[in-house]
Amino acid sequence: MTSGATPRPLSFPGLLIWRVGGDLFFASIAHFDEGLKAALAANRPAAKHVLVDADSVNFIDTSACDAALNSIKELQGQGITFAFARVRDDVREWMRLGGIEAVVGPTNFYERVTDGVRAWQQRGILEVPPRNRG
């Protein structure tokens, strides 16, 4: 499993678009946690919002749900907000059962990454940088 920041043609100050590169299970969740925290530490200006691109996640087990939930809560405690995009229905159901959906908020799940970015812009969470306007 690989994870990383998803290259995007548009950039938004304070936003990290994080792409999960595979299934999440007991043996891979540490890579997710460590990679996400490293990407947040390297992101400048400092990201306060994380949009997780979960298109490559076909499976998540209960141990991964528990570990991801703990990581999300820890980072939320540091003022970081989360949303998810491109989550498959069965993975979303496991996330709901595992408590991730309740902590992130059911309205913070989007069909596409661009839907999440637009929603956060409309709610005033993200600003469109001047170079990306018009």
Go through the PLM ranges and name each one:
Residues 2-134:
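Structured cytosolic domains appended to multi-pass membrane proteins
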